[in-house]
């Protein structure tokens, strides 16, 4: 059974890039904003969430807060993406409950390692 990854980004090009890259190894669902993603989460549970910070309707910060308040998604790993690379934004994401943060443009190999680290933490730790 393949792991399911939820992608949330208002930029269609980023969603398509991520879908193409990740669909080789994972089942991928993509949404264009936090509200649509929360509706989808009502009946679905991904193994990992990749979410943009700056989006219309509901930004990534608000999305994380909502996800962490729900019992069934409380421990789902979240990787945040942002076009703004600064420590303030990164720290805010971590404080709200994100496991990782990547600045756009990102290296797909780095994203791949972050996904593996979050989906298989014990196995990943044993690599070293």
Residue ranges and their predicted role:
Residues 12-29:
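Two-component/phosphorelay signaling modules centered on CheY-like receiver
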Residues 31-35, 90, 108:
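Conserved Asp/Asn-Gly motif in the active-site loop of CheY-like receiver
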Residues 30-48:
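Acidic, metal-coordinating helix/loop segments flanking the phosphotransfer/catalytic sites
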Residues 106-116:
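C-terminal output helix
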Residues 55:
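Receiver (REC) domain active-site loop signature in two-component systems and cognate sites
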């Amino acid at each position: 059974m393949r792991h399911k990854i939820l992608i949330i980004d208002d930029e269609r090009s980023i969603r398509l890039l991520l879908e193409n890259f990740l669909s080789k190894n994972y089942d991928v669902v993509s949404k264009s904003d936090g509200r649509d993603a929360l509706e989808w989460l009502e009946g679905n549970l991904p193994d990992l969430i990749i979410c943009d910070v700056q989006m219309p309707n509901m930004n990534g910060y608000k999305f994380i807060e909502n996800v962490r308040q729900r019992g069934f998604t409380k421990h789902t790993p979240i990787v945040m993406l942002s076009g703004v690379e600064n420590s303030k934004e990164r720290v805010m994401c971590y404080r709200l409950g994100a496991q990782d943060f990547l600045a756009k443009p990102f290296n797909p190999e780095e994203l791949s390692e972050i996904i593996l680290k979050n989906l298989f933490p014990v196995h990943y730790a044993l690599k070293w």
